[in-house]
Amino acid sequence: QRFIHPTYRPPPQPRRPVIMRA
């Protein structure tokens, strides 16, 4: 189990995934 800090904020997800860029 990973300890998540109360002040930890996940990075905002990009609107368009660059990985699926063709």
Swiss-Prot record:
Region (Disordered): 1-22
UniProt record, GO biological process: defense response to bacterium; innate immune response
Originating organism: Heliothis virescens (Tobacco budworm moth)
Oligomeric and partner information: Monomer.
Name used for this protein in its record: Heliocin
Main location: secreted
Tissue specificity as recorded in UniProt: Hemolymph.
Single GO cellular component term: extracellular region
Modified residues (Pyrrolidone carboxylic acid): 1
